[in-house]
Amino acid sequence: MRQKTISNKNKQTKNTNNISLRRKLGLMYKKAILVLKIVLMIFVCLFVFTKYFTSIKTYLITNIYQVTTKLGFRLENVIIEGQQNVDELTILKVLNANKSSPIFSLKLDEISNNLKKSKWIKEVYVSRRLPNTVYIKLFEREPIAIWQINNQLFLIDEEGYKISKDIQPFSHLLHVVGEGANIYASKLVLELQKYPALLNKTLVAIRVGDRRWDLNLKGNISIKLPEKEFETALKYIDALNKTNKLFNQNYKALDLRDRNKYYIQKY
């Protein structure tokens, strides 16, 4: 019995030693892997984010471009969607690549950021369509009016953003004048678009006190719109126009600021 007890104790001791050794080896292995990962990460950071190994990087990248180009990954087509007012040559100039250039050499983020420098472009999406096409989707700003401020004229979009000083191609748009007119022009234009005949006869919309609008119509007719709910006043003016009671009544001014009582002045 005593010999068996001693034998069992020896076996337990050996098992304990084996487990302890395996644990130590396991910990050493984990530490070695961790150190290897850290070294590898440092090497990658040095390779990518520093000037070390510049010649090696250049050599590798150049060879990758050459190989992929031979495999057909080269620029052959450029698809542009959403382009209306931005000059196509300007877009291609920003692309800055010749036909058959390595398609992977194109820096898409840089192209996108450079395109956004155009005041016409609100948003842009650039992607590769492998193996040989670059796709450019433009979201241009849509001009809604011509804004006059400090004796200068600007083409503006629905947000009041100044797109361009070249207003000639858009001379048919509503002319808005005054401080803040660019910000509030969108709502006025949207309402006037409900009455095309009235919009067509509106020459200028003047922002008064940054609170309300005065409209100057053809025939030297001036209309003072209310500060609030000017939509009702526009509906009234359109009704007068449709019944031929606006432009052939010798009207000089219509004061519609008081919704309960309208004032009409004749020449």
Curated annotation (Swiss-Prot):
One of its GO terms (cellular component) is plasma membrane. The chain crosses the membrane at residues 33-53. Residues 54-267 are periplasmic. The keyword rRNA processing does not apply. Residues 1-32 are cytoplasmic. Its main location: membrane. One of its GO terms (biological process) is FtsZ-dependent cytokinesis. Residues 73-141 form the POTRA domain. It is found in: Cell inner membrane. Keywords: Cell cycle, Cell division, Cell inner membrane, Cell membrane, Membrane, Transmembrane, Transmembrane helix. It is a single-pass type II membrane protein. PANTHER family: CELL DIVISION PROTEIN FTSQ (PTHR35851:SF1). HAMAP family: FtsQ_subfam. Essential cell division protein. Belongs to the FtsQ/DivIB family. FtsQ subfamily. This is Cell division protein FtsQ. It comes from Rickettsia prowazekii (strain Madrid E).
